């Protein structure tokens, strides 16, 4: 005990880690017995002092950290700014989530650090502080939840919830925080139950793999070793891990410091020797590990090293395999199934920040960087090579070198303050921080129309797909508008770009029958008004009828408005044709069914000359049965001339139509069945059958009569003719003519019965054989053609039309030719005659060259009453219009086709009431996703807002241009109000938004001369060249668009500043929120420019969504999206370090080498690359051998590192050698490949690595094989003992296979001896029954190895084991 005087007295706090270190040093110095005596004394001292102190734990001991308030407030402020940026469209959802989580994680971690300092300064003897920080019970994370803040939690799917729990358990949780906490709490409860069973099963599998590993030799004689260096080329290995790695190992080589040998081969390492290596800074130390041992079925003492129990070399007969399996499996109960630790979840590796040392100006070479976005969506510069950044102060110039692939967060010439972050250094070296790809779906939070920027790739990823990829960062916009589906409507009158009344539409689409006021009351109210007053005051007041709109059924074609309203309309002469629709009352008088008239308008709205405009199918000319059509006399019908041929678009094949010149036609009915060629017909040809006779197995006849069977290509046509059969005499004249119609009055002359015919009959001669014939007299249905439907009853006359430029001609068409058979599809009826309205216009006037006219629907609303019109415009083109100086009313910038033809104004109010104005909008028509129904999007003035007037706007560059006498000015569709049709651009929607000049135009009406007030737009239209076109037709001035100043509001932590830019506002341009257009204030909404006026802008509300490259956009351009529809899918990478999958599942993934684990993703790629390169350099046999060897070394290193990383992250210490024994077993097999066929092994066979090498040496030929990673389960089922395999899993299969193969079990392992009740070959019985090969035999093998594989001597060992990452794992 004389050494006691030399010991130094320490007076400082000692925690659990320091006690462990102290015990380790005591064992090294004084041995086990003396150390245990000292520890007993420490234990007694501890109990005595704890009793005397009488520490208790109460709720008052939980002290909240004072700085928590402002820390949380600061984080909330940052989150608020982030939310604003997301709303403005500056960052997308994934960037917002990432940044939000990192803000709160940083706050939580800072609070955790403050907690320890706070306790230490204010109350060092606080029981909570002493309990947790001494390591007695509880850890920093648990105490942090008690007195700090609970922080971020994960949801049941393992994703982070970006709403943090700001309270701690001492303060108490709010209801929301409590529910969020329950996710983690429930997971914890389930964890505890499942963890024990999982850990037990893991232990069983581990022991199964290595139960036969016993120490059976002192030295295996290996020459291999693995190098460990404290100063790694990638990063410094921590001293503690370096010491843990080396202590208890055996050296594989002599260690030299200079020329002096300080340690010998096969010497075991203690703490003193390791400290000497650290002191002298030895570069690399080669040690022996279980990996280097030359046998897979046992291990030698030197390769295993010291026993952890007594500190000496392991004894012979020690069952180190079972110890290793239990050492790894037992701490499994301490591991969590899923961690709740959230650090670095969304970060891809650690990032270091470079801060400015003092205030100054930044200078760097801008050519060496290029702009990018950080993972938080902040603008930054990415540098590809080393970049020198200079910070210039008044008297100091400081230079910083930024490594490649780092982000520069400041601009050139920017002033930075001291400690401001100027760069973020990303870790450029390869680490095992594997990434996983995660999908994040963004859903629309409003309904409207989808709009892409030009940056979206319009070609979908797959054919017939609506997923579009994004090549670069851009915005997606959801333009506002309320949508309705029109699936209930058979034929919708509303077309794209029409103006409509919104309540009218909504009432129709919901429940019209529930209206309390019916159409009779509307008409009564209308007709009871004084019509003489109407001419004076303009329009009677029907404001109380605003809610009564539309008709009582769903057909949009008809509307309960009366053509007496026509005098409320005005129109320009000779260039339009208006067709008002008939009211319901008039239809009921004419007994026309509601769905009778179908108006056919082409998709593009273009009519050609003589095209069918509408048709009416009279139900009187409808038949359900098949038959033959006959005209009265063949001379009476004539086919329409070729140039007047009508194209009927209702059917796919154009049928020729015949214009009827006669008053009647005949229909001869017959029953027709078209049967497949293989049908079994149960009746004979030319036989007579009755009604309901079975023709085939499942077809019965509907009429009786004569059967006629005709066999055609691949089908049989069976006809049944009803009628009388007549066998005529030779003198009968009728029988000589076949296929004639006989009118009433003529009788059968030679028949015994003589009577006059009452109806028409059809006589048909039928000849079954050459000699025999008879006549079939068939009944005929006669159809008289009624007078044509009066056009005026269908379409009331337009009061304003002076001259009919456009004519509607009524034609009756027979849809089938003379003698042609009519065929129906299943039970559908056959229409024989169709009444068509053919559109034509004057051939004489100047517009006779027009072959096409445009048409569209117009809806006119008068104080809640609505009238629908079809407007057909005789204008040469909708793009250009020739000005006429002679007619000022027809001249102007906008063509007559583009002007709004209808406008009615009440002289009392001047402008319509605001409520009515907001109830009108423009229809945008879309196809729905299911393609079954069309959707309408209604854009009303409530979806728009106005900015202006801009009083400070200056007009620049007034250019005088000489305009020819009749110039053609091109106006594109986008030049008018965007999103509304130019044809009817100002119809109610934007009345409050536009400024008008009122001019009087005198119109001559049939009734009286009245003055009508028209309003002409005084706003400017911009053409495609960006010029503003002057609406005054007589002036030659063309203005440039005015320029507005933009102010971008930059929010900084220290100050706000404005940056002024100048731009041209053009139609269709998008604005994000918080962009200053006027000097006074930023405008508060985002949207798209709809109308540009002289001093103001009309903007349609829109919501921006930012999307970054690689995102997938769902839906098509201009498709209607509803609230909750998937808008974008982001695919982003998330770190797969020990944070998402943690604890037992992680260890299990690694040990089972599952495909979902990142080992197979990253390691396999590296292994394949290595094998290819080596095979190419060295050729096939050597390439495979060395490639397999390197592969095995690589995979072993990776597996050990990954398993240790998981355990260390949970604070569990396991010695490397235990993991190495397990990993050695799961990497000890190789797969025989097909490249080099051998006579011993089959391709695809699993054999041991050492077995393959020995066989190759014995045969003196190389066996080609590849390395394979087996999981622990698969390795357990691929051992040398079938008894061990059968007792693990799949007993019947394993035993049956072993019996078929005739396998022999040599009972070398522990388990098989236990099963059979023998002595286990471990401990005292390890050398019983074991066969030892002679020393001479061993020498022969070694000599052969030296002869054939001399390549593995000397320097080759360094090639195979040069990896210095083996023990290089982060804590």
From Swiss-Prot:
Zn(2+) binds at residues 220, 293, 300, 303. It is found in: Plastid, Chloroplast. Belongs to the RNA polymerase beta' chain family. RpoC2 subfamily. One of its GO terms (biological process) is DNA-templated transcription. Pfam families: RNA_pol_Rpb1_4, RNA_pol_Rpb1_5. Binds 1 Zn(2+) ion per subunit. InterPro entries: DNA-dir_RpoC2_beta_pp (IPR012756), RNA_pol_beta''_euk (IPR050254), RNA_pol_Rpb1_3_sf (IPR042102), RNA_pol_Rpb1_4 (IPR007083), RNA_pol_Rpb1_5 (IPR007081), Rpb1_funnel_sf (IPR038120). It comes from Lobularia maritima. NCBIfam families: rpoC2_cyan. One of its GO terms (cellular component) is mitochondrion. HAMAP family: RNApol_bact_RpoC2 (MF_01324). Its cofactor is Zn(2+). Its EC number is 2.7.7.6. The keyword Zinc applies. This is DNA-directed RNA polymerase subunit beta''. In plastids the minimal PEP RNA polymerase catalytic core is composed of four subunits: alpha, beta, beta', and beta''. When a (nuclear-encoded) sigma factor is associated with the core the holoenzyme is formed, which can initiate transcription.
């Amino acid at each position: 005990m004389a050494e006691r005087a030399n010991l130094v007295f320490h007076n400082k706090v000692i925690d659990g880690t320091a006690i462990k270190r102290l015990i380790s040093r005591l064992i090294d110095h004084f041995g086990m017995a003396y150390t245990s005596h000292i520890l007993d004394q420490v234990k007694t001292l501890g109990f005595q002092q704890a009793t005397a102190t009488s520490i208790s734990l109460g709720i008052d001991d939980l002290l909240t950290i004072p700085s928590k308030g402002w820390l949380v407030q600061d984080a909330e402020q940052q989150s608020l700014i982030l939310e604003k940026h997301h709303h403005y469209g500056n960052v997308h959802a994934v960037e917002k989530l990432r940044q939000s989580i990192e803000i709160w994680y940083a706050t939580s971690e800072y609070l955790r650090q403050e907690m320890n300092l706070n306790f230490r300064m204010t109350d060092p003897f606080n029981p909570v502080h002493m309990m947790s920080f001494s390591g007695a019970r509880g850890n920093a994370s648990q105490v942090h939840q008690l007195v700090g803040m609970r922080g971020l939690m994960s949801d049941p799917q393992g994703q982070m919830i970006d709403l943090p729990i700001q309270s701690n358990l001492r303060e108490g949780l709010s209801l929301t925080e409590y529910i969020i906490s329950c996710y983690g709490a429930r997971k914890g409860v389930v964890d505890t139950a499942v963890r024990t069973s999982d850990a037990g099963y893991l232990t069983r599998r581990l022991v199964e793999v290595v139960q036969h590993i016993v120490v059976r030799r002192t030295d295996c004689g290996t020459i291999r070793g693995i190098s460990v260096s404290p100063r790694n080329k990638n990063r410094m290995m921590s001293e503690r891990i370096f010491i843990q790695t080396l202590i208890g190992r055996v050296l594989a080589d002599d260690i030299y410091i200079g020329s002096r040998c300080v340690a010998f081969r096969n010497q075991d390492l203690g703490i003193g020797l390791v400290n000497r290596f650290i002191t002298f800074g030895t570069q690399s130390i080669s040690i022996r590990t279980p990996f280097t041992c030359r046998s897979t079925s046992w291990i030698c003492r030197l390769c295993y090293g010291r026993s952890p129990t007594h500190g000496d070399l392991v004894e012979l007969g020690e069952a180190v395999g079972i110890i290793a399996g239990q050492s790894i499996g037992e701490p499994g109960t301490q591991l969590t199934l899923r961690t709740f630790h959230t650090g670095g979840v969304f970060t891809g590796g650690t990032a270091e920040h470079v801060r400015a040392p003092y205030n100054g100006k930044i200078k760097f070479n801008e050519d060496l960087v290029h702009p990018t976005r950080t993972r938080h969506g902040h603008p930054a510069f990415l540098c590809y090579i080393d970049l020198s950044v200079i910070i210039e102060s008044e008297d100091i110039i400081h230079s910083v070198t930024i490594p490649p692939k780092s982000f520069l967060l400041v601009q050139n010439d920017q002033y930075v303050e001291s400690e401001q972050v100027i760069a973020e250094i990303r870790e450029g070296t390869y680490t095992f921080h594997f990434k996983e790809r995660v999908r994040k779906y963004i859903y629309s939070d409003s309904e409207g129309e989808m709009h892409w920027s030009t940056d979206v790739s319009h070609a979908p990823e797959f054919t017939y797909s609506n997923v579009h990829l994004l090549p670069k960062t851009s915005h997606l916009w959801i333009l506002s508008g309320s949508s309705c589906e029109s699936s209930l409507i058979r034929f919708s009158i509303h077309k794209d770009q029409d103006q409509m009344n919104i309540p009218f539409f909504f009432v129709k689409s919901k429940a019209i029958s529930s209206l309390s006021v019916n159409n009779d009351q509307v008409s009564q109210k209308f007709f009871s008004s004084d019509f003489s007053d109407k001419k004076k005051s303009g329009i009677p007041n029907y404001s109380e009828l605003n809610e009564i709109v539309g008709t009582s059924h769903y057909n949009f074609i008809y509307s309960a408005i009366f053509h007496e309203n026509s005098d409320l309309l005005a129109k320009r002469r000779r260039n339009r044709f208006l067709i008002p629709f008939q009211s319901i009352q008039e239809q009921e008088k004419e007994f026309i069914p509601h769905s009778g008239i179908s108006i056919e308008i082409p998709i593009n709205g273009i009519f050609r000359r003589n095209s069918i405009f509408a048709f009416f199918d009279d139900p009187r000319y409808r038949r359900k049965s098949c038959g033959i059509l006959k005209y009265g006399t063949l001379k009476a019908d004539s086919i329409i001339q070729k140039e007047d041929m009508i194209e009927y678009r209702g059917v796919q094949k154009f049928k020729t139509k015949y214009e009827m010149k006669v008053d009647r036609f005949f229909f001869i009915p017959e029953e027709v069945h078209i049967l497949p060629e293989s049908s079994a017909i149960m009746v004979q040809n030319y036989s007579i059958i009755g009604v309901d006779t079975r023709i085939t197995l499942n077809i019965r006849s509907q009429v009786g009569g004569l059967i006629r069977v005709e066999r055609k290509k691949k089908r049989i046509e069976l006809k049944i003719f009803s009628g009388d059969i007549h066998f005529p005499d030779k003198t009968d004249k009728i029988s000589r003519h076949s296929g004639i119609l006989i009118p009433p009055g003529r009788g059968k002359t030679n028949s015994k019965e003589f009577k006059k015919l009452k109806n028409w009959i059809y006589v048909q001669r039928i000849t079954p054989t050459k000699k025999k014939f008879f006549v079939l007299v068939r009944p005929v249905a006669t159809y008289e053609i009624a007078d044509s439907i009066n056009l005026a009853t269908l379409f009331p006359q337009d009061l304003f039309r002076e001259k009919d430029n456009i004519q509607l001609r009524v034609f009756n068409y027979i849809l089938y030719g003379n003698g042609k058979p009519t065929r129906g599809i299943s039970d559908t009826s056959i229409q024989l005659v169709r009444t068509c309205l053919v559109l034509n216009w004057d051939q004489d006037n100047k517009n006779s060259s027009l072959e096409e006219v445009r048409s569209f629907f117009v809806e006119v609303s008068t104080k809640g009453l609505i009238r629908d019109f079809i407007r057909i415009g005789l204008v040469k083109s909708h793009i250009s219009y020739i000005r006429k100086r002679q007619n000022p009313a027809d001249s102007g910038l906008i063509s007559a086709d583009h002007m709004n033809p209808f406008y009615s104004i009440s002289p009392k109010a001047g402008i319509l009431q605001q409520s009515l104005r907001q109830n009108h909008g423009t229809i945008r028509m879309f196809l729905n996703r299911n393609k079954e129904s069309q959707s309408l999007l209604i854009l009303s003035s409530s979806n728009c807002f106005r900015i202006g007037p801009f009083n400070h706007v200056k007009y620049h560059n007034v250019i005088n241009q000489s305009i020819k006498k009749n110039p053609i000015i091109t106006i594109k569709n986008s030049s008018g109000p965007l999103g509304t049709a130019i044809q009817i651009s100002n119809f109610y929607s934007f009345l409050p938004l536009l400024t008008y000049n009122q001019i009087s135009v005198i119109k001559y009406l049939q009734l009286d001369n009245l003055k009508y007030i028209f309003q002409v737009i005084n706003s400017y239209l911009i053409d495609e060249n960006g010029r503003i076109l002057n609406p005054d037709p007589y002036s030659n001035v063309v203005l440039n668009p005015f320029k507005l100043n933009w102010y971008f509001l930059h929010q900084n932590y220290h100050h706000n500043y404005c940056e002024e830019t100048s731009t041209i506002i053009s139609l269709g341009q998008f604005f994000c929120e918080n962009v200053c257009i006027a000097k006074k204030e930023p405008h508060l909404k985002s949207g798209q420019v709809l109308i540009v006026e002289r001093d103001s802008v009309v903007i349609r509300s829109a919501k921006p969504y930012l999307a970054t490259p690689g995102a997938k956009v769902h839906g098509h351009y201009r498709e209607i999206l509803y609230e909750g529809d998937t808008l974008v899918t982001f695919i982003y990478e998330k770190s797969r370090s020990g944070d998402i999958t943690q604890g037992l599942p992680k260890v299990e993934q690694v040990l089972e080498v599952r495909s979902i684990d990142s080992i197979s993703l990253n390691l396999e790629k590296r292994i394949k690359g290595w094998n290819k390169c080596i095979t190419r350099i060295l050729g096939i046999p050597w390439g495979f051998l060395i490639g397999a060897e390197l592969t095995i070394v690589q995979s072993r290193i990776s597996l050990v590192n990954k398993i240790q990383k998981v355990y260390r992250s949970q604070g569990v210490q396991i010695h490397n050698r235990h993991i190495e024994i397990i990993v050695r077993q799961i990497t000890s097999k190789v797969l025989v490949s097909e490249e080099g066929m051998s006579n011993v092994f089959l391709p695809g066979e699993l054999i041991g690595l050492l077995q393959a090498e020995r066989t190759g040496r014995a045969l003196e030929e190389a066996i080609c094989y590849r390395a394979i990673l087996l999981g622990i389960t698969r390795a357990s089922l691929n051992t040398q003992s079938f008894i061990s395999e059968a007792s693990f899993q799949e007993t019947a299969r394993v035993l049956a296979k072993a019996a078929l193969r005739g396998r022999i079990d040599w009972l070398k392992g522990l388990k098989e001896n236990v099963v059979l009740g023998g002595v286990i070959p471990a401990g005292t019985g390890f050398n019983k029954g074991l066969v030892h090969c002679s020393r001479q035999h061993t020498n022969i093998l070694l000599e052969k190895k030296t002869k054939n594989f001399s390549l593995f001597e000397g320097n080759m060992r360094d090639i195979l084991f040069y990896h210095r990452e083996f023990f290089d794992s982060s804590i």
